Amino acid sequence: MINSLSIIKRITYLLFVLIFVCVIFLVNHIFNHANLPINEILIKGQYQHIDREQINLITEEYVQGNFFNLNLYEARSAFKQLPWVRDVDLRRKWPDQLVITIEEHKPIARWEGIGLVNDKGEIFIASTEENLPIFVGPENFVKEMTIKFREINKILAKELIHISIIKLSERLSWEIKTNNFIRVVLGKKNVSSRVKSFIKNYQFVLAELKSEIDYVDMRYRDGFSVRKTKKKNKDKTLNSTI
């Protein structure tokens, strides 16, 4: 019994010494590397609009200090100021690397001519010459507009049509203009079913009139109305085949 206790004490003592040595070694290692510089910077992410030269300038200015005292917050804030940067992640990688992962805004539309809308339904300010559809509506409904834009475009694609302008009024009434210059009034309710009705009637009725159409009003329960571009023609109401 005494021998067993003696053995346990010895093992405990040895473990204590081992832990103590490891701690001393670790502290010494950190102390000796207190001035460890960042020797390699890895840039990750796919981007088309972000200027690589701007990334390099920010890296040179803000990636200062060693592995331990590098101010990642300031560097991240600087990257976030670039027009096309949606998000950025900076991460230290032992022993001397900094990994920068950049997420670029992916534009899907213009916002009333003063900004752009990304695929997450967020408005951002940047410039591009891309031919993009236009969103017009209350700014706090941009996410809803993004969802509705995709939903309607998916239905229109059956006839190789897509949205050039989508509008949401202050009273939350929807309206679109297609790439073949047809304005479609959809109203507040049953928007998807009204778009489907528009496509169904487009195939059999509206396609032949498209060059003459000013707008199509789909807010009728069992039909729709068409206003022709020529002023001498009065509004014409057609029964849909729903």
Residue ranges of predicted features:
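Extracytoplasmic/secreted envelope proteins and their assembly/folding machinery
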Residues: R52, N56, L72, R76, ...
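Short secondary-structure junctions
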Residues: K80-R86, K154-H162, L206-K210
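Terminal hydrophobic membrane-targeting helix
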Residues: N32-T128
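N-terminal positively charged amphipathic segments used for targeting/anchoring
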Residues: M1-P37, L42-H49, E53, Y62-V63, ...
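Extracytoplasmic segments of membrane-associated envelope/inner-membrane machinery
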Residues: L98-V184
